[in-house]
From Swiss-Prot:
This is Protein transport protein SEC31. Residues 852-879, 912-922, 1100-1110, 1135-1148 have a biased composition (Low complexity). One of its GO terms (cellular component) is COPII vesicle coat. GO terms for biological process: COPII-coated vesicle cargo loading; endoplasmic reticulum organization; protein transport. Residues 797-1156 are annotated as: Disordered.
Length: 1261
C-alpha cells in the first residue's frame, strides 16, 4: 500500500469531518514516553496536503496548543455553531475539553470552548453520536459513562449506577442505525448495550469468559451485529456477535499473534474491517466471512489505534508506539513492492545483511479480491459497437446486478432511411429511387444529378441525354421556319456568294463522305438509270457550240469516264455544286477531294461548316477542345450524336474537365454543375465524386446554418446518406467496376473510400452491421483505415475468416523421419533380426561372459573419457532420442516374464530410417496402461476389449524371445520414432543444463506403480538436441524412458531439488560395491533406483560401480577422471544453454479481441466444444476438465498475441478444429500427432489440452 503521509507523533488521533481537504487532530498519548523523555502534552492539527505529490513525507503541525494532561482518546465532529467543527479530548486527568477547530487553525487564544470534570478518573473513550453531533458519550474509570450535550456540557447525565461497576470502560461505540443505542466494553470483560432513551442497560454480553475488551464496533448496516476484541496476548481474538443470539459469538477472527488493541469498521463497506494490536500488525478483514484479506506493512512497535477516513475510505491512518502515525491507502500501485524487491536483492548480496535489513521497507502482501463497495456503481451504462447499449443496475432488494443489452439509435431516421434504400436496391427499383429523390431534393444541383442518372437508365441513354438538353424539337422547328422563308434563284441552286478561298484549314486526317446516307442523291441517280431505253420528247445536244472551254473539258472527261479530271476542272473553275455532282459519280476518292476543297474554301464561313468538318472527319476532339464553353450543351449533343462508343466517355470527360477548370478559375457554380453532367454522361465516377463531395459539404453547412431543431449529426448523416445513394445508384447504372481494388496505394477513389468508411461506421453504430460490411467490401483489401472496421464487424457478427481451412485433405498419420545427424564415431552395426529360425542363436539372450560389451562402442580400442563427463556426437547410424511432448508410444510388454535378478541393461534404440514410420495404434487403446496425460479412468464409455490386428510394416511387434524387450525389424524401415525408445546407457550422464538434479529417490510419477505398469514420462517441451535424457527407475521386461525434470503438473508433485554442486569440481570415484563394472546391453534391469545425476557440467561422483558411456569402451576398473577437455560434440556453454526469459505479452491473458481472422475458427470451435464437454462431464472429473480448459486458454492467449505459432501451424490447427467440429476424431488425432512431431518448438502446455479435448469430445455424447 502507498504511504501518503507520516506524522511523527506518539498520539491518539481523529479525522476531520466533512468532505473538505482532510486534517488530522492528534493528542499526546497518555502514558507514552517520547524519545526526549518530555512530559509535555499537546493538541495538534495536521494538514495532510494531499495535493502535494511527495509521498511519505513527514508533516509539520499547522496548529498546536498545550494541554494539562495526556489523551486517551480524541474525537472531531461537525457543529452548527462552529465552522470547522468541535474537537473533544478525553484526558488522563478526567477532564473533557472541547476546542473550536477553526480558532485553533487561526491561532486564536480562546480556542478552548469548555472543560468539564464530571469523571472522577481518567476518561478512556469518547465518541460523538453519528446522527446527533451535539451528543457526546464518554466512558472512563470505575464504570463511569456520561452523555453530554454540547449546548450544555455541565448538565451531562450518567448511565448506570456507580455501585454496579468498579471496572473501567475501555471503549464505546454508537449504533449506526439506531441513534439512541450505545455499546461499551470494559476491562472486566463486560460488553454492555445501553438504551440512552431509557438510560438503562438493554443487554450484557459475556466476552468469552469475561476477557477484557479493548475495542467495540457496530456493523454500519445491521443494527444487531457488533464486533469486540481481546487485548490479551494469550487470546488475540476478534469476536463477531449477533445480538439475536447473545450466548456465543457468531464468528471468531483469528490472525493476530498478540493482543488486539483497536478496531475500525468501514462505514461505506461492511465487508472491510481494520484491526491492529500488540503484534505490530494492521490486518484487513472481511467480517462477514471471517477471512483476512491480508496485512499492511508491519512496524517496529505496537499499533494501538487505526481509523478509516470517514469521508474517503480509500485511505486510513494507524498510530503506533514507534512514534509515527502513518496515513496510507488501501490501493497498491506496486511501485513500493518493486523497489523493495531491489533493495532486498541488494541486501542478500551484501555482507552487512543485518545492517541493511532494518532499513529494508516493508511491502504489502495482499490485494483486495474485489473492489470496495464505494467503488461499485449502483447503475452504469456503456455504449457498445453495433448500436448496442449495455446497462447494469441493482436488482430490487439485493446487491446483485442485472445486465441488459438493448439497441440504441443516435438518429432513428438513419435506420429507416438505410432500410428503405437497401430494400429498393435489392428489388432493383432504381428508377423509383431516382424519382423519389428528384421529388424530395431541395437544391437544384441535387435534382439535376438525379435527373441525369435517371436518363442513363433508359435503353438509349445518349439519345435521352440529347433530349434532356432540349435538342429534340429544335431541328424540326428550324426546318419549319426556313420553309416559310423565300429564297432567290441563286440561293436555291446553291450558287450564292461564297467567301474568297482561304488556306486556313488543313486537310483532315480522316475524311468520309457526307453523302453516304444521302437518300435524295441515291434516288436521283436511280431516276436517271431508270430512264434508260425510255422514249423521251426532250432531245438535247452534247455540244451546243456555245459552251466554254471548261464545259468542253468536263464533257470530254465524263465521256471517257475520267471523273477525277472532270472534278479538277470544276474545282479550278470554282464550280462547287458541279464538283460535288461529279464527285458523286466518281466514287469515294473524288468525294473526299471535293469535301476537302469545300472546307478549305469555307474556313472563314459559317460555324456549321467547322462542325460539319469535325463530324465528317470524325474529329470531335476539335469540338471538345475548341468550342466555346457557352455552347457546351451543343458540344455534348454533337458528341452524343456522332461519337463512337469507344471515344464517347473520353470526349465527355474532356469537356467536363474544361468546365471544371472554368469553375476553379471563375468560381462559377454553374460550370461545376455542367461539369458534373459531363462526368455523369461519361460514367467517370472518380471525377463526379469529387464534385459531389464538395456539394455535400456546402449543403451540410447551409442546412446547419438554417436548421431549427435538427442536430449537426443528423444533418451530416442525411447529407452523407444522399451522397452514398447517388454513388450506389450511379455505380449500378454505369456498371462501374473498380479497377484499383487490388492496388496498395495511390487510389483515384480515395476520397470515396473515406466516405464509404465513414458511412459504414455510422450504419454500424445504428446496428446495421450487414450494410456496413457491404460497403467495407467495396474498399481495397489493403486499405489501411479499413482494417479496424473490418475486424470489429467480423468480431461483432462472429463470422469465421474467409480463409478457413476446411477443404484440405487431412494431415498424414505419420510424422516424417527425423534428420540423421553425422558424428565422428562409427558404432558397430546392429545385427539384422528377421525372426527366429531353427538352430539360430538368440542374440538377445544374456551373454555368458562376465565382462559386458557395448554394442554402440567403437570396434577398436580408443581413449575414453571418464564416466559422467562424456562428450559425444551422434553417429550416422543412430540419432539420440529427441525430446517430445506427448503421444509417446511405449514398447509392448515381453511375451515371457523376465527374471528378477541378474545384471541390468537398457534396450538399444531403433535404427534410423529414411522413411517415415507409421503410427501404431495408440497405446492406451491397445492396453489398459494409462499414459500421463490420458483421459481419467471412467470418463468415457468403456471400450470392448478386443485383439488388435497388426498392420503390416507399421505396427510394433513383440519379441519372440524370452527375457527381452520387443524390437521392430531394423531392416523394414518402419521403426517407431526414436523418442519412443530409451537411449542405450550404462551410466548416468549429466542432466540438461537448466535445473539441478533430483534427490536420491524414485521419480514421483512412477513411485508406487506395479512392475510392468510404468507410464511413459512426458519429456520437456524444449531441450538441446545433444542433451541425453536422464536415467529413470526401470521395471523388468519394459524399457521405460528416463525421468525428465519438469515444472509443476496437476498429475504429480514437483521433485525436491538439492543444492547445486560445484560445476568444476573433479569427480570423486569410489570403489565398486560388489557389482560389475558394466551391464549387458539387453538384459532387463532389476527393480531398483538409480543414483542421482550430478549438477550441470559437473563430473559424476560415483557411489556405485562406475558406469560406462554409451559411446566409449567400458572401464576395467576405477580410474581417475582426466581434466575437462573441450570436444566438438561437447555440451554447449552455460550462456548458450540458459533459457531466455519469455517475452512480455502484448495483450493480457484472457483477452480474445485480437485473435487474427485465420485463427478465429480455432478459438470458436475449440472453446465451443470445451463448453459442451464441461457442461456434460461427470462431476468426478471436474478437476481434469478445468485443467484442460486452462491449457486451451494458453493456446488462445498465444493466438491473441500472435506469438509462438507459425502460420502453417495455425492452418493445421484450423483443420484439427474443423475435424473436431465434424466429429472426425481420427483425423484430429493424426493432425495433433503431426504437429507434435514436426513442430515441437511451438508446442507447450496447450498441446496437452488439445489432446485431452479430442478424447473428452469423443467420449462425451
Amino acid at each position: 500500500m502507498v504511504r501518503l503521509r507520516e506524522i511523527p507523533r506518539t498520539a491518539t488521533f481523529t479525522w476531520s469531518p466533512g468532505s473538505a481537504a482532510p486534517f488530522i487532530a492528534t493528542g499526546t498519548r497518555a502514558g507514552a514516553v517520547d524519545a526526549d523523555f518530555s512530559n509535555e502534552t499537546f493538541l495538534e492539527l495536521w494538514n495532510l496536503d494531499l495535493d502535494n505529490d511527495k509521498l511519505g513525507q513527514e508533516l509539520e503541525p499547522v496548529a498546536k496548543i498545550s494541554t494539562e494532561s495526556g489523551f486517551h482518546d480524541i474525537a472531531w465532529a461537525e457543529s452548527e455553531d462552529h465552522t470547522r467543527g468541535v474537537i473533544a479530548g478525553a484526558l488522563e486527568n478526567g477532564s473533557l475539553d472541547l476546542w473550536d477547530a477553526d480558532k485553533l487553525l487561526n491561532g486564536a487564544s480562546d480556542a478552548l470552548i469548555s472543560s468539564a470534570s464530571k469523571h472522577t478518573g481518567p476518561i478512556k473513550a469518547l465518541q460523538f453520536n453519528p446522527r446527533h453531533s451535539n451528543l457526546l458519550a464518554t466512558g472512563g474509570g470505575k464504570g463511569e459513562l456520561f452523555i453530554s450535550d454540547l449546548n450544555n456540557v455541565d448538565q451531562a447525565f450518567r448511565l448506570g449506577s456507580g455501585a454496579a461497576r468498579v471496572d473501567d470502560i475501555e471503549c464505546l461505540d454508537w449504533n449506526k442505525k439506531v441513534p439512541h443505542i450505545l455499546v461499551t466494553g470494559s476491562s472486566a470483560g463486560f460488553v454492555t448495550v445501553w438504551d440512552v432513551k431509557t438510560k438503562k442497560e438493554s443487554l450484557t454480553l459475556n466476552n468469552l469468559g469475561r476477557k477484557a475488551v479493548s475495542a467495540v464496533a457496530w456493523d454500519p448496516e445491521k443494527p444487531t451485529k457488533l464486533i469486540t476484541s481481546i487485548p490479551l496476548e494469550t487470546d488475540p481474538l476478534i469476536l463477531v456477535w449477533d445480538l439475536r443470539n447473545s450466548n456465543a459469538p457468531e464468528r471468531v477472527l483469528r490472525g493476530h499473534e498478540s493482543g488486539v488493541l483497536s478496531l475500525s469498521w468501514c462505514a461505506q463497506d461492511p465487508d472491510l474491517l481494520l484491526s491492529c494490536g500488540k503484534d505490530n500488525r494492521t490486518i484487513c478483514w472481511n467480517p462477514q466471512t471471517g477471512n483476512a484479506y491480508g496485512e499492511f506493512p508491519v512496524v517496529t512497535n505496537w499499533t494501538f489505534q487505526t481509523r478509516w477516513n470517514p469521508h474517503n475510505p480509500n485511505m486510513f491512518a494507524t498510530a503506533s508506539f514507534d512514534g509515527k502515525i502513518v496515513v496510507q491507502t488501501i490501493q497498491n500501485t506496486r511501485q513500493d513492492a518493486s523497489q523493495a524487491g531491489n533493495n532486498q536483492e541488494q541486501a542478500v548480496n551484501d555482507e552487512d545483511f543485518f545492517a541493511k535489513a532494518q532499513t529494508r521497507p516493508q511491502i504489502s502482501t495482499f490485494s483486495l479480491p474485489k473492489a470496495p463497495k464505494w467503488l461499485e456503481r449502483p447503475v452504469t451504462a456503456s455504449f457498445g459497437f453495433g448500436g448496442r447499449v449495455v446497462s447494469a443496475g441493482l436488482s430490487s432488494g439485493s446487491r446483485s446486478s442485472k445486465i441488459t443489452i438493448s439497441h440504441f439509435d443516435v438518429d432513428p431516421n438513419v435506420g429507416s432511411a438505410t432500410e428503405n434504400f437497401e430494400s429498393s436496391v435489392k428489388t432493383g427499383d432504381f428508377r423509383g429511387i431516382c424519382e423519389s429523390r428528384i421529388a424530395s431534393s431541395q437544391c437544384e444541383e441535387e435534382k439535376t444529378d438525379w435527373k441525369v442518372i435517371e436518363t442513363l437508365l433508359s435503353d438509349n441513354p445518349r439519345k435521352q441525354l440529347v433530349n434532356y438538353l432540349g435538342f429534340s424539337n429544335e431541328v424540326d422547328e428550324a426546318a419549319d421556319s426556313l420553309s416559310k422563308l423565300g429564297l432567290d434563284k441563286k440561293e436555291a441552286n446553291g450558287e450564292g456568294q461564297l467567301s474568297p478561298k482561304s488556306e486556313g484549314v488543313k486537310k483532315h486526317k480522316r475524311i468520309t463522305s457526307i453523302f453516304e446516307t444521302n437518300v435524295e442523291g441515291e434516288s436521283f441517280l436511280d431516276e436517271i438509270a431508270s430512264s434508260k431505253g425510255a422514249k423521251t420528247n426532250n432531245p438535247f445536244q452534247i455540244y451546243t457550240g456555245s459552251e466554254s472551254e471548261a464545259d468542253r473539258a468536263i464533257t470530254r472527261a465524263l465521256l471517257l469516264g475520267q471523273f477525277e479530271k472532270a472534278l479538277d476542272v470544276c474545282l479550278q473553275e470554282d464550280r462547287m455544286s458541279d464538283a460535288f455532282m461529279v464527285a458523286v459519280c466518281g466514287g469515294q476518292k473524288c468525294i473526299e477531294k471535293a469535301q476537302e476543297a469545300y472546307f478549305s474554301k469555307q474556313s472563314e464561313g459559317p460555324s456549321f461548316v467547322r462542325l460539319l468538318a469535325s463530324v465528317v472527319g470524325k474529329n470531335l476532339w476539335d469540338v471538345v477542345h475548341n468550342a466555346g464553353l457557352a455552347n457546351w450543351k451543343e458540344a455534348i449533343a454533337a458528341i452524343c450524336t456522332f461519337a463512337d462508343d469507344k471515344e464517347f466517355p473520353d470526349l465527355c470527360e474532356a469537356l467536363g474537365d474544361r468546365l471544371e477548370e472554368s469553375y476553379r478559375s471563375k468560381k462559377a457554380k454553374q460550370a461545376r454543375k455542367d461539369a458534373s453532367f459531363c462526368y455523369l454522361a461519361s460514367s467517370k465516377l472518380e471525377k463526379v465524386v469529387s464534385i459531389w463531395i464538395q456539394e455535400l459539404k456546402e449543403n451540410e453547412a447551409y442546412s446547419i446554418q438554417n436548421a431549427t431543431d435538427d442536430t449537426s449529426f443528423s444533418i451530416h448523416v442525411r447529407a452523407l446518406q444522399s451522397f452514398i445513394e447517388k454513388v450506389t445508384v450511379f455505380r449500378h447504372v454505369s456498371k462501374f467496376q473498380d479497377p484499383e481494388r487490388q492496388k496498395s496505394s495511390d487510389w483515384k477513389l480515395s476520397s470515396l473510400y473515406e466516405k464509404y468508411l465513414e458511412y459504414a461506421d455510422v450504419v454500424a453504430s445504428h446496428g446495421r452491421l450487414d450494410v456496413a460490411e457491404k460497403y467495407l467490401d467495396l474498399l481495397p483489401a489493403s486499405y489501411p483505415e479499413a482494417e479496424v472496421a473490418r475486424s470489429r464487424i467480423q468480431f461483432a457478427t462472429k463470422k469465421p475468416a474467409s480463409k478457413a481451412a476446411t477443404g484440405r485433405a487431412p494431415a498424414p498419420r505419420h510424422p516424417p523421419t527425423a534428420p540423421t545427424l553425422t558424428g565422428t564415431f562409427q558404432p558397430a552395426q546392429i545385427p539384422t533380426h528377421k525372426g527366429p529360425a531353427p538352430g539360430s542363436v538368440n542374440q538377445f539372450a544374456p551373454p555368458a561372459l562376465s565382462k559386458p560389451t557395448n554394442p554402440y562402442a567403437p570396434t577398436t580400442t580408443t581413449s575414453y573419457t571418464s564416466a559422467g563427463g562424456t562428450t559425444y556426437t551422434p553417429t550416422t547410424g543412430y540419432q539420440p532420442p529427441q525430446p517430445r511432448q506427448s503421444n509417446v508410444i511405449p514398447p509392448p510388454q515381453p511375451l515371457a516374464p523376465p527374471p528378477q535378478s541378474g545384471p541390468a541393461g537398457l534396450a538399444p534404440p531403433p535404427r534410423a530410417s529414411s522413411q517415415s514410420p507409421s503410427v501404431a495404434a495408440p497405446y492406451t487403446r491397445a492396453t489398459n496402461i494409462p499414459a500421463w496425460n490420458d483421459l481419467p479412468e471412467g470418463f468415457g464409455r468403456a471400450a470392448t476389449p478386443r485383439r488388435s490386428t497388426p498392420v503390416t510394416g507399421s505396427s510394433v511387434i513383440s519379441s519372440p524371445f524370452p527375457n527381452t524387450p520387443s524390437l521392430t525389424q531394423p531392416g523394414s524401415h518402419t521403426s517407431p520414432p526414436p523418442s519412443t525408445m530409451p537411449a542405450p546407457r550404462d551410466s548416468v550422464p549429466p542432466p540438461p543444463p537448466k535445473g539441478p538434479a533430483p534427490p536420491r529417490m524414485a521419480s514421483p510419477s512412477t513411485a508406487g506403480i506395479p512392475h510392468g505398469l510404468q507410464p511413459a514420462e512426458r519429456p520437456p517441451s524444449r531441450t538441446h538436441v545433444y542433451s541425453p535424457p536422464l536415467a529413470q527407475q526401470t521395471s523388468p521386461g519394459m524399457a521405460v524412458p528416463p525421468p525428465i525434470p519438469r515444472g509443476p503438473s496437476p498429475y504429480n508433485a514437483p521433485p525436491t531439488v538439492p543444492p547445486p554442486t560445484n560445476r568444476y569440481a573433479p569427480a570423486q570415484v569410489s570403489q565398486p560395491t560388489g557389482q560389475l563394472h558394466g551391464q549387458p546391453p539387453i538384459a532387463p534391469p532389476p527393480h531398483s533406483s538409480m543414483p542421482p545425476p550430478p549438477g550441470p557440467y559437473a563430473p559424476q561422483p560415483f557411489q556405485q560401480a562406475p558406469a560406462q558411456s554409451p559411446y566409449a569402451p567400458p572401464p576395467t576398473g576405477p580410474q581417475a577422471p582426466p581434466p575437462p577437455v573441450s570436444q566438438q560434440g561437447s555440451r554447449p556453454s552455460t550462456a548458450q544453454s540458459q533459457k531466455k526469459a519469455p517475452p512480455a505479452q502484448k495483450y493480457p491473458p484472457g483477452d480474445r479481441s485480437h485473435i487474427p481472422a485465420n485463427a478465429q475458427p480455432i478459438y470458436e470451435i475449440l472453446s465451443s466444444d470445451m463448453q459442451r464437454v464441461k457442461a456434460r462431464a461427470p462431476a468426478a472429473f471436474k478437476a481434469q476438465v478445468n485443467d484442460t480448459e486452462r491449457r486451451l486458454n494458453i493456446l488462445f492467449d498465444h493466438l491473441n498475441n500472435e506469438d509462438l505459432l507459425q502460420p502453417s501451424t495455425i492452418e493445421s490447427m484450423a483443420e484439427l478444429a474443423h475435424a473436431i467440429q465434424v466429429k472426425d476424431y481420427e483425423t484430429a488425432q493424426a493432425i495433433h500427432l503431426d504437429i507434435l512431431t514436426n513442430k515441437t518448438d511451438e508446442c507447450g502446455n496447450w498441446m496437452v489440452g488439445v489432446k485431452r479435448l479430442i478424447g473428452m469430445s469423443r467420449a462425451t455424447p
